[in-house]
Swiss-Prot record:
Binds 1 zinc ion per subunit. Its main location: cytoplasm. IleRS has two distinct active sites: one for aminoacylation and one for editing. The misactivated valine is translocated from the active site to the editing site, which sterically excludes the correctly activated isoleucine. The single editing site contains two valyl binding pockets, one specific for each substrate (Val-AMP or Val-tRNA(Ile)). InterPro entries: aa-tRNA-synth_I_CS, aa-tRNA-synth_Ia, Anticodon_Ile_BEm, Ile-tRNA-ligase, Ile-tRNA-ligase_type1, Ile-tRNA_ligase, M/V/L/I-tRNA-synth_anticd-bd, Rossmann-like_a/b/a_fold. This is Isoleucine--tRNA ligase. A motif ('KMSKS' region) lies at residues 608-612. One of its GO terms (cellular component) is cytosol. ATP binds at K611. Monomer. HAMAP family: Ile_tRNA_synth_type1 (MF_02002). Its cofactor is Zn(2+).
């Protein structure tokens, strides 16, 4: 028996079937580094239009988690796809380096005894060490960027740039000093930004407290009475007993009705709607004597329960009827709404009582409670209220309360002298900041679109931005304040530039070591040099100034406006927010044209990731077991607009999908064996009809993919590429061409046509997957035939695809109909295999009973129909002649019948044909194979 295997064009490639990504990816990273891939991209892109994705800096602390990996991979997919689309898309990674978490780490490691200078020195060392660790992890994910020259907010140039950004805002009149309640953490000893606040359940003691009336006649008149017949009091309800010593007013709603209730011993003022629930809570019976509109009670004075001072009634719209008494006790130093209301009624800063110190302890001079920590003083305050007869009720409730994101301890609002960026303050020119920012939001594109309304609501309702902190590790606020007037030095902006120049050379230490006389000369003894540092959100929020037009100068020629900022949904109140405010203050527009928000990672059951639940996924572990490309494929396959589910099982599914794509690539490469595009590539018009369709289908898909990439719809890219590999290629085209590829002459038109199509498909596919499967695409690139440059990323989308000309007889619609017929035939062939009627598809002969239109279509393929259906014989018969046993199909006007071939099997092509053995020299093969071996070779026209 002759072995005809050597006469076949069998697939052959060195491209490995087994990916071995954990071992192979580091080798590819080394190659990218050795060829200077990022620098090469900058060189070839210098004359291209620019696309700037500005990196939101992760914090330089700890190992990266799955959220970091997701974020960086998304950014990398955009940068790579924009590069392929013909843009110069630089990517400068950055790090946020200052702030409390690093200072806290240093304190934990070295103790709190350190000097401020030593603290800063150790913080700088710690941040640098953390950056190196994170950088290695990000590079391992295949993220392409300027890793040798990232930006760091602690770089001297960036610290100086931040001071210059602040100077711009001072110059334009946005910055002011004020006393305002800010989020305060006793453990941090500092104000916190909104983004540093998280909410958790807390048990609090609630109290109902009676404030005796001081203006009895006015209260009587307000309720339409000649006089009061017995003692009267107004009742407040609060969850913060510790604020009672700082009470300075009582707030009621101007539109609510208030009742004067006779309870026997005294009269109580309560919101009419809450009388019943309050009396029940106090275990009292009573009757309403009179009612009055809230506005009628304005400015009536009541007495503090245990201090000799008055608390007037102020009207406030924020009072609610959901709980309590309808009366809110007001401590302007410890509540935002209280502060605003008291200021509206003319209270000046010097009149505001601030008995709580930065460590949470009352000042020693406070009667009854001096020297006590506020949380521990609560029982003593309740006892005092009970002692003076003011306590109506107390109970403990559990409610959501603000906590420090770092220490997990409860926060308070605390009025302190701080520096603010005014939201509604009139600048030297133009509109106030809030107005500017709201306009800028309208000019910004949001992905997903709901982000616009979210950010708009935050900006519309936010208070002034407190930018000062009382910490050591931060960029200084280099102000000199007059000792007598408290005013800024008249040359503040000029002095800030002098400080910035020094910081540029020596870092922030230059300010802290500066002797004021060096800048102020003889004036130095008249001014205080302040020690406050900037909110870290100001650090990252001004990177558009000190990175894009500063340390790295990667903005557009028209200015430092990025095309895209991309971060998690929490950054609407973080980096997106602070960047918007600084951009609008300095440049009067947002520093970005588009904002993309991604959701948070959850496990497959929708639960948040946490070490306690044991459901975290560590990027390093995935890299070392499955490979970074699997993680990248998961990112691409997941809709980032909501929560993103990830687990070991989900990643395993990504690995399965990866194998299908890799196997497709391997099939393409192995069937390009011996193909030299410079020698063997056919013109489109010389190719077979099916091959021309395959190239046309590839072109249509590429157009769709380019659009999906430009809109950042990576999950659509993934699904369409995966479906193309599995269905159009694996389930149709690649299956059909195997016979022609393997059995026809090595240099025949039939085979070269097929290889030309495979070459075009490969060139397109390798680029499609390059933004997602960064490592695998570059690996494939090395195995493609023909001369080529060093990396797929040094190219654009493939331009060698040709469209089917208009008027082509076998057009797209034609092949769609053929695919539908083939799917129906495959279904019946599978049934016959299951029933063991046939062993394989080539053992089948199929008769198609088709209506007139379909019959004409199928007839165009002639004898080549059998190659399309991958059966040994195929015939088309009029639909009316279908016998009873013919199988109906989902294709209208088509029935079919499959029978087992009665002919011998060709030992070379495996088709069952009547002419097997008809050639005496080759008794084991069919005449087609004989012709391909020793004759002119078969001629194919269609498939």
């Amino acid at each position: 028996m002759t072995d005809y295997k050597a006469t076949l064009n069998l697939p052959d490639t060195a491209f490995p079937m087994k990916a071995g990504l954990p071992q192979r990816e580091p080798q590819i990273l080394q190659r990218w580094d050795s060829i200077g891939l990022y620098q090469k991209l900058r060189e070839i892109g210098k004359d291209r239009p620019k696309f700037v994705l500005h990196d939101g800096p992760p914090y330089a602390n700890g190992k990266i988690h799955i959220g970091h990996a997701l974020n960086k991979i998304l950014k990398d997919m955009i940068v790579r796809s924009k590069t392929l689309a013909g843009f110069d898309a630089p990517y400068v990674p950055g790090w946020d380096c200052h702030g409390l978490p690093i200072e806290h780490k240093v304190e934990v490691t070295h103790g709190k005894h350190l000097s401020a200078d030593r603290t800063r020195e150790l913080c700088r060392e710690y941040a640098a060490e953390q950056i190196e660790g994170q950088k290695t992890e990000f590079i391992r994910l295949g993220v392409l960027g300027d890793w040798d020259n990232p930006y760091k907010t602690m770089n001297f140039a960036n610290e100086a740039g931040e001071i210059r950004a602040l100077a711009e805002m001072v110059k334009q009149g946005f910055v002011f000093k004020g006393l305002k309640p800010v989020n305060w953490c006793f453990d941090c000893g500092s104000a916190l930004a909104e983004a540093e606040v998280e909410y958790a359940d807390k048990k609090s003691q609630t109290i109902d407290v009676a404030f005796p009336v001081a203006d009895e006649a006015k209260l009587a008149a307000a309720f339409g009475l000649a006089s009061l017949t017995k003692p009267a009091a107004i009742v407040i309800w609060t969850t913060t007993p510790w604020t009672i010593p700082a009470n300075q007013a009582l707030n009621i709603h101007p539109e609510f009705k208030y009742a004067l209730v006779d309870t026997g011993e005294r009269l109580l003022v309560l919101a009419e709607e809450l009388v019943e629930s309050c009396l029940k809570r106090y275990n009292l019976e009573g009757s309403v004597v009179a009612t009055a509109q809230g506005s009628a009670l304005e400015l009536i004075n009541f007495r503090h329960p245990f201090y000799d001072r008055l608390s007037p009634i102020y009207l406030a719209d924020y009072v609610e009827l959901g709980a309590g008494t309808g009366v809110v006790h007001s401590s302007p130093a410890y509540g935002e709404d209280d502060f605003v209301t008291c200021k509206r009624y003319g209270m000046v800063n010097d009149d505001i009582l601030t008995p709580v110190q930065s460590n949470g302890v009352y000042v020693e001079s406070l009667p009854f409670f001096g020297g006590q920590f506020i949380w521990k003083a609560n029982p003593a305050i309740v006892e005092k209220l009970s002692e003076v007869g003011a306590l109506m009720h107390t109970e403990t409730i559990s409610h959501s309360y603000m906590h420090c994101w770092r220490h997990k301890t409860p926060l308070i609002y605390r009025a302190t002298a701080q520096w603010f960026v005014g939201m509604d303050k009139q600048p030297s020119t133009g509109e106030p900041l809030r107005e500017r920012a709201l306009k800028a939001i309208e000019d910004t594109k949001f992905v997903p679109a709901w982000g616009q309304a979210r950010l708009h609501a935050m900006i519309a309702n936010r208070p002034d931005w407190c930018i000062s902190r009382q910490r050591n590790w931060g960029v200084p606020i280099p102000f000199f304040l007059h000792k007598q007037t408290g005013e800024l030095h008249p040359r503040t902006v000029e002095l800030m530039e002098e400080v910035a120049k020094r910081v540029e050379q020596q870092g922030i230490e230059a300010w802290f070591k500066l002797d004021a006389a060096e800048l102020l000369g003889a004036e130095a003894d008249q001014y205080d040099k302040i020690a406050d540092t900037l909110d870290v959100w100001f650090d990252s929020g001004t990177t558009h100034w000190h990175v894009l037009r500063g340390s790295h100068d990667i903005g557009h020629a028209t200015g430092p406006r990025a095309d895209l900022y991309l971060e998690g949904s929490d950054q609407h109140r973080g980096w997106f927010h602070s960047s918007l405010l600084t951009g609008c203050a300095i440049d009067n527009h947002a520093p970005y044209r588009e904002l993309l928000t991604h959701g948070f990672t959850v496990d497959e059951n929708g639960r948040k990731m946490s070490k306690s639940l044991g459901n975290t996924i560590e990027p390093e572990k995935v890299n070392n077991t499955l490979g970074a490309d699997i993680l990248r494929l998961w990112v691409s396959a997941t809709d980032y607009s909501g929560e993103m589910a990830v687990s070991e099982q989900i990643l395993q599914r990504s690995a399965d999908a990866y194998r299908r794509i890799r196997n497709t690539a391997r099939f393409l490469l192995s069937n390009l064996s011996g193909f030299d595009p410079a020698r063997d590539l056919l013109a489109s018009e010389d190719m077979l009809a099916l091959d021309r369709w395959a190239v046309d289908r590839t072109l249509l898909l590429q157009r769709e993919l380019e659009e999906h990439y430009s809109e950042y719809r990576f999950w659509n890219v993934y699904s369409k590429v995966h479906n193309f590999c599995v269905q159009e290629l694996g389930g149709f085209y690649l299956d059909i061409i195997k016979d022609r590829q393997y059995t026809t002459g090595a240099n025949s038109v039939a085979r070269r046509s097929c290889q030309t199509a495979l070459f075009h498909i490969s060139e397109a596919l390798v680029r499609w997957i390059a933004p997602i499967l960064a490592f695998t695409a570059d690996e494939i690139w090395q195995y493609l035939p023909g001369e080529r440059n060093e990396s797929v990323m040094l190219n654009g989308w493939y331009q060698g695809l040709s469209e089917l000309p208009e008027g082509t007889e076998l057009d797209r619609a034609y092949w769609d109909r053929v695919m539908a017929v083939k799917a129906s035939v495959n279904k019946e062939l599978e049934n016959q295999r299951t029933a063991k009627v046939i062993g394989g598809n080539l053992q089948a002969e199929v008769t198609l009973y088709a209506d007139e239109g379909l019959s004409a279509d199928l007839g165009k393929l002639g004898d080549e129909l059998r190659f399309v259906l991958i059966t040994s014989a195929a015939s088309v018969v009029p639909f009316a002649q279908a016998p009873a046993e013919a199988v109906a199909t989902e294709v209208e006007g088509l029935k079919l019948k499959v029978v087992k071939s009665g002919h011998a099997k060709c030992g070379r092509c495996w088709h069952f044909r009547a002419d097997v053995g008809s050639h005496p020299e080759h008794p084991e093969i069919c005449s087609r194979c004989v012709d391909n071996l020793s004759g002119q070779g078969e001629v194919r026209h269609y498939a």
